[in-house]
Structures are given as structure tokens and as C-alpha cells.
């Protein structure tokens, strides 16, 4: 571990991004899977990723305590926009985790039976629910969460820490799409033709339709509950209040 807290944080961020972009996000992953199998690869990569996240979190805490450097002073009204963005992020993260999707790890079975029809009603058609809006709801949630924290905090440590998550969430959809295209071929092409990475892109271009009934109300409410729990428990969990100072 490097002695300088900021350099240590930067190294942790580089490690976190590196293993996702240059291992998981490239053909190197394909070769490793062929060598050791999908299950062992996923297990080893999960451990490596967890280790990188733990290092990143510890480095962030240390840098925040020892070398706190303001880059800009957030305006008071930024807080309201950031909290709204995080509310949307919480809902997207929940929906991304509960929706069966071919973009999720091990989610290729979601395309079984897909026949390429774009009306979203055929058996096995995965382009439904939140996936009509974006095929990467979880990563869009992470991106909103990360950017909101960067803007709201305004310090160097937050820029590096949350910026690492923002970079991965921005690049991640392209890496995942490329992996799925290589592995699933025509089945992926049919799904991608009915969906979009950019929210509402497929709907605005007439390739899909917005059907909020497929999303329902339960899981968005769970997202709101997650948001409220984190907002009111932020100080207890992380030592910093997320609520506006009166």
C-alpha cells in the first residue's frame, strides 16, 4: 500500500476499473472461461472484484480523513437535484436486480424462446418492463448515484472514488453488449434491436413501447424504501448526513 492516501485511492480505483474493463470486458474473459469454466471464473472474478471494492472503500475513507481537498463548493440547490437523481437511481438499481435480463450476469436464459418479434408479447421475449426503457437499468442507476455524489461532495477523494463507479457504469453497457453479441449471436441481435442502452431510446425511435404496467408498483416502491432508508440512515452508516442542513 502506498503511503500517500490520495495515490493509494487512485491505485485502488485503477485496480477496480482495470479488472472490469481489461479482464471482464475483453476477450480475455472468453479465454479464461474456456480454460477453467464459467462457474470457476465467476467465483474467482467475484472474489477479485470484492477485494478491489474493499480496497477502494478503505482507501476512500483514509484519503477523506487525512487529505481532504475541496475542488469546488457545491451550491445549496445542488443537494435537491442530487437527492432526486439518487431516488431515481435507487429505483433503477432495484428494478435492475429483480428483472430477468440477458444483460445480467448469467442472464442469457432470458432470451430462450425469443423469436425476434418486437411487440414484447411473445413467450420468452425479454424486452419487457424496465428493459423497454433501457437494457441496462442497474448501471444507469449506479451512474446517477455516482455522479450525484461527485457533484454534491466536491472534493478530490469523492471525485476519484465515485468517479471510478461512474466510469465503469458509463463504459459497462458497451462492454456487456459486446460480450453478449459474441456469445449469443442472432438472439442478442434480436433483443438489442428492440431495446436501447440510452433510456427511452428504443421507445422514441419506435422500436418498443412504454408499458408501465409491466413494471408494476411493488418494486418501484421498494426502490423508494431503499432510498429513504439510505437517506435517513446515511449518517449512521457512513458518518455523514445525507439530509439538507437547515
Region spans (language model):
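Helix-boundary and loop/linker segments of multi-pass membrane transporters
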Residues: 1-3, 34-35, 73-74, 117-121, ...
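Membrane-water interface of alpha-helical transmembrane segments
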Residues: 3-6, 10, 39-43, 72-83, ...
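Alpha-helical transmembrane segments of integral membrane proteins, especially early/N-terminal helices
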Residues: 5-13, 39-55, 132
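Membrane-water interface of transmembrane alpha-helices
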Residues: 19-25, 91-111, 175-190
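Membrane-interface helix termini and inter-helical loops of multi-pass transporters
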Residues: 29-32, 62-75, 236-245
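Portal/gating segments that form or line small-molecule/metal binding sites
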Residues: 48-131
Amino acid at each position: 500500500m502506498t503511503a500517500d492516501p490520495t495515490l493509494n485511492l487512485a491505485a485502488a480505483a485503477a485496480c477496480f476499473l482495470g479488472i472490469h474493463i481489461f479482464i471482464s470486458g475483453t476477450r480475455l474473459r472468453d479465454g479464461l472461461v474456456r480454460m477453467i469454466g464459467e462457474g470457476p471464473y465467476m467465483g474467482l472474478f467475484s472474489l477479485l472484484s470484492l477485494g478491489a471494492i474493499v480496497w477502494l472503500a478503505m482507501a476512500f475513507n483514509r484519503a477523506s480523513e487525512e487529505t481532504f481537498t475541496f475542488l469546488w463548493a457545491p451550491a445549496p440547490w445542488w443537494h435537491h437535484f442530487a437527492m432526486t437523481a439518487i431516488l431515481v437511481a435507487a429505483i433503477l438499481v432495484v428494478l435492475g436486480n429483480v428483472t430477468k435480463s440477458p444483460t445480467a450476469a448469467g442472464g442469457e436464459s432470458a432470451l430462450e424462446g425469443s423469436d425476434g418479434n418486437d411487440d414484447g408479447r411473445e413467450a420468452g421475449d425479454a424486452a419487457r418492463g424496465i428493459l423497454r426503457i433501457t437494457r441496462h437499468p442497474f448501471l444507469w442507476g449506479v451512474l446517477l448515484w455516482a455522479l450525484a455524489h461527485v457533484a454534491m461532495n466536491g472534493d478530490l477523494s469523492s471525485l476519484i472514488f465515485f468517479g471510478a463507479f461512474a466510469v465503469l457504469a458509463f463504459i459497462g453497457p458497451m462492454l456487456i453488449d459486446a460480450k453478449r453479441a459474441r456469445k449469443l449471436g442472432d438472439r442478442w441481435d434480436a433483443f438489442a434491436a428492440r431495446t436501447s442502452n440510452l433510456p427511452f431510446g428504443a421507445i422514441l425511435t419506435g422500436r418498443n413501447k412504454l408499458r408501465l404496467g409491466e413494471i408494476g408498483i411493488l418494486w418501484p416502491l421498494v426502490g423508494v424504501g431503499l432510498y429513504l432508508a439510505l437517506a435517513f440512515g446515511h449518517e449512521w452508516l457512513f458518518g455523514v448526513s445525507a439530509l439538507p442542513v437547515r
